[in-house]
Swiss-Prot record:
Biological classification of the source: Bacteria, Pseudomonadati, Pseudomonadota, Betaproteobacteria, Burkholderiales
GO cellular component assignments: cytoplasm; small ribosomal subunit
Native source species: Bordetella pertussis (strain Tohama I / ATCC BAA-589 / NCTC 13251)
Protein name: Small ribosomal subunit protein uS19
Function: Protein S19 forms a complex with S13 that binds strongly to the 16S ribosomal RNA.
Regions crossing the membrane: none
PROSITE patterns: RIBOSOMAL_S19
Record InterPro entries: Ribosomal_uS19 (IPR002222), Ribosomal_uS19_bac-type (IPR005732), Ribosomal_uS19_CS (IPR020934), Ribosomal_uS19_SF (IPR023575)
Name of one Pfam family that matches: Ribosomal_S19
Family: Belongs to the universal ribosomal protein uS19 family.
Length: 91
């Protein structure tokens, strides 16, 4: 179920503070955040946000196609290495 339009997008307050400071200071350093649940806003375009995936911070460059999505969608949490090969079929 999607979020109600009248509520507006959710963004953590501490992330908005960091983004405003980066935009005002023309800072190019990645903004570190653990807030995977925050929605990407148009103010984020052109910034690099390092989103935590449970193990490390994954740097993500925000472009206009990402607006409206959640930050967690771009930092994958699971790594799939493939299923084990069947030893009988290799013979």
């Amino acid at each position: 179920m999607s979020r109600s339009i009248k509520k507006g997008p959710f963004v953590d307050a501490h992330l908005i503070k960091k983004v405003d400071a980066a935009v005002a200071g023309k800072d190019k350093k990645p903004i570190k955040t653990w807030s995977r649940r925050s929605t990407v806003l148009p103010e984020f375009i052109g910034l690099t946000i390092a989103v935590h995936n449970g193990r490390q911070h994954v740097p993500i460059y925000i472009n206009e196609n990402m607006v409206g999505h959640k930050l967690g969608e771009f930092a994958l949490t699971r790594t799939f290495k493939g299923h084990a090969a069947d030893k009988k079929s290799k013979r």
